[in-house]
Amino acid sequence: MSILVVYYSRSGNTRRVAEAVASACDATLLELVDTANRAGFKGYMKSGKDAMLSKRTEIEPPKQRADEYDLVIVGTPVWAFTMTPAVRTYLEQERNAIRKAAFFCTMGGSGANRTFNTMKRTCGKTPCATLALSERESKSEKLDKFVAGFVEEINKASAQDPENC
C-alpha cells in the first residue's frame, strides 16, 4: 500500500509526529507550506482567529499528488478546537483525490474529536484510524509507542475493510 503523510506544523510538534508516522509505515512525507506569515505573537493570534473562523489560506502547490497514493494520512495541530487553515485548504483541494484517509493531531489542550470530525466532513472520508497527542506526548520517549499503535490501527482497518482503508 502506498502512503502519503501530509502535515502542517507551525512549532515543530506536528512535524515530529509526522516524521515518526512516515518512518513507521515507510511513507512519503509532504509538509504543507502556508504562505501567510504566522510567526511570532501576531502570527499566533492570527492563526487562532483564522482557524476559529474556518478560513482557508494560500498554500504552496503540493509536491506529491494525493491521487497517486492508496492512503493519505493527514496531521494538524489543533488551533481553536479545529484544524489549521493550511490543512483545511489542502483537504478541500484534494477532496476528490484522496481515496482513503487517516488523521492525527497534536494539541496543547483539547479539541481532537471536534478536529477529526471537521477533517472528516471537509475531505468527505471517514478516517480508518486517528491519533491525538498532547504536546507533552509528542515530545516524550513514548512517541514511537503511540505511533506504532496508530500504524497497527491502520493495518487492522485495512485488513478488515480494504475498500475504506
What are these regions (language model features)?
Residues 1-74, 81-92, 145-165:
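N-terminal beta1-alpha1-beta2 submodule of the flavodoxin-like/Rossmannoid cofactor-binding fold
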Residues 66, 92-99, 122-125:
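Short, conserved loop/helix-junction motifs that constitute active-site signature segments
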Residues 74-75, 103:
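Redox-cofactor binding/interface segments in oxidoreductases and associated redox assembly factors
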Residues 77-80, 108:
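Short glycine-rich anion-binding loops that position phosphate/pyrophosphate groups of nucleotides
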Residues 33-35, 79, 104, 132-133:
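Residue-level "edge-of-site" marker
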Residues 1-2, 97-102:
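Short, surface-exposed connector motifs at secondary-structure boundaries
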Residues 102-142:
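Short, glycine-/small-residue-rich phosphate/pyrophosphate-handling segment
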Residues 13, 99-100, 106, 153:
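P-loop/Walker A phosphate-binding loop and immediately adjacent motor/lid segment at beta-alpha junctions
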